[in-house]
Amino acid sequence: ILVNWGGGFPTPEIVGNVDNQNLHALKDIEYVVVTNPEFVYQAKDLAEFHQKEDGMNVAVVTTDQVYNEFSSGTPDPTAIRAFMKMLWDKASKSEYGVYPQYLLLMGDGTYDNRGILKMNDNNKILTYQSVKSLNETSSFSCDDYFGYVEDGSFGYNNLYTNKRINIGVGRFPVSKAEQAENLVNKVKQYYALGPGEWKTKVLALADDNDEQNSSSGYHSFSTHQEEAITTLE
């Protein structure tokens, strides 16, 4: 044992305050908005709009709140899924429980969750990365991960085979407050326009491979997905 008789105990450094929170108290939430703290104002604006127009119970929470309560303060995409599963499980245990139906992530994402490439403008909300990272056609980021919350609904291969996602998941890929405000306004405009022929038009985009006969499977996969979408009635 080495003892430094001339030293002293370290002095704790005060970093800041942590506000009290209790996300576990939430219940009967139909629409959840998980937002980067930079876009709280826009997220609350959208929540109030849906509450008024659709009569839904909407909750707005920040990524910091989710991480604090579901991953001990460590940024982790699984914390978002754990939060949604908590809401789902709470509804399943109640005779008249309201299940969460929609999850909106307000903030851009990137494959570089650890920030190694210093793409701060893109890394607003962490993404889930597929476990098959060594295969070019099976490696991807997918927000569907956050919507598989029912017991037994998610496993190693479920993102490839399971089509029964429990919660609809969307993302506003915004990096600035102005972008978030623009997308919120687009939602409001969508409601204001009402029904019409414009709602029957779909734009389908698909990537392809430069070498169409390549064994990589890029071309056939992308083309088949595009054709499947365009045949929907």
Where are these regions (language model features)?
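Cysteine-dependent hydrolase recognition
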Residues: I1-E233
